[in-house]
């Protein structure tokens, strides 16, 4: 027996049903989008009211400022965006991070001859606080990170490199890849590293280790001690400065020397 073909009417019916389902789906999607837009608008309004109410706390308290920034991020609001909108006029946070960015640049330039353009976030934070004086708004390390991210518009000069549980701030336009970052992390505890330490810890060939260290030397980010016992030591000024400061604090507080 031959199967009967599907009639033109049935095909038309099927297409009409599909079109209706598609139309219904579009309407539902538009409704959901409208509801989400209304919710976001309501969140934004509430956030503006919250900001107006807690304006002074946001400006003066670094921890409160972090929480506020996180609240803004959840609905895609950037209080640091340039331009004179509600946020910059209400809170002055745009000006705050701009001024902080300028101060960060000044500190990094002043110390560049000493550390080659790399500094720990903790040391940068200390210098920034020292330069601001007692009457200025308090600044947290989170504030410094946010200000540095805004400085990226100036080019690839400024960046943040994770090292262990902390960060290094890069203020020179040196190209640092993953190999360089791993070596910086390895040098974190002592402030220096050797070719053999890199080879044994990272399972690298000699040439790869030397290539990375030579690049750091060329960029002024590392110094070499050729007279060190055993083999040459490659010192990272940013790291050993921080370690030296830690040691002084321990000595002053009566800790182990």
UniProtKB/Swiss-Prot annotation:
It is found in: Cytoplasm. Residues 28-50 form a coiled coil. Its main location: cytoplasm. Transmembrane segments: none annotated. One of its GO terms (biological process) is multivesicular body sorting pathway. It holds the Pfam family EAP30. One of its GO terms (cellular component) is ESCRT II complex. The keyword Transport applies. The keyword Ribosomal protein does not apply. InterPro entries: ESCRT-2_cplx_Snf8, Snf8/Vps36, WH-like_DNA-bd_sf, WH_DNA-bd_sf. Keywords: Coiled coil, Cytoplasm, Protein transport, Transport. Component of the endosomal sorting complex required for transport II (ESCRT-II), which is required for multivesicular body (MVB) formation and sorting of endosomal cargo proteins into MVBs, and plays a role in autophagy. The MVB pathway mediates delivery of transmembrane proteins into the lumen of the lysosome for degradation. The ESCRT-II complex is probably involved in the recruitment of the ESCRT-III complex. Component of the endosomal sorting complex required for transport II (ESCRT-II), composed of snf8, vps36 and vps25. PANTHER family: EAP30 SUBUNIT OF ELL COMPLEX, VACUOLAR-SORTING PROTEIN SNF8. Belongs to the SNF8 family. This is Vacuolar-sorting protein SNF8. It comes from Xenopus tropicalis (Western clawed frog). The gene is snf8.
């Amino acid at each position: 027996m031959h199967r009967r073909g599907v009639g033109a009417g049935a095909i038309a019916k099927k297409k009409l049903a599909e079109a209706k389902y598609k139309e219904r789906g579009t309407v539902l999607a538009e409704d959901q989008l409208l509801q989400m837009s209304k919710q976001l608008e309501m969140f934004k309004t509430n956030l503006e009211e919250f900001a107006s109410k807690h304006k002074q706390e946001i400006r003066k308290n670094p921890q409160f400022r972090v929480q506020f920034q996180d609240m803004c991020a959840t609905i895609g609001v950037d209080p640091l965006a340039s331009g004179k909108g509600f946020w910059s006029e209400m809170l002055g946070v745009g000006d705050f991070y701009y001024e902080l960015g300028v101060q960060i640049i000044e500190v990094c330039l002043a110390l560049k001859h000493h550390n080659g353009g790399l500094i720990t976030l903790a040391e940068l934070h200390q210098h920034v606080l020292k330069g601001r004086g007692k009457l200025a708004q308090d600044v947290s390390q989170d504030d410094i990170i946010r200000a540095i991210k805004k400085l990226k518009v100036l080019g690839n000069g400024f960046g943040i490199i994770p090292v262990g549980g902390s960060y290094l701030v890069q203020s020179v336009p040196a190209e640092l890849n993953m190999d360089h970052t791993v070596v910086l992390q390895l040098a974190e505890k002592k402030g220096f590293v050797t070719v053999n330490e890199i080879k044994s810890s990272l399972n690298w060939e000699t040439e790869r280790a030397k290539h990375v260290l030579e690049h750091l030397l060329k960029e002024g980010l590392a110094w070499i001690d050729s007279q060190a016992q055993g083999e040459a030591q490659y010192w990272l000024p940013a790291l050993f400065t921080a370690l030296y400061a830690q040691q002084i604090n321990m000595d002053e507080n009566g800790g182990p020397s």
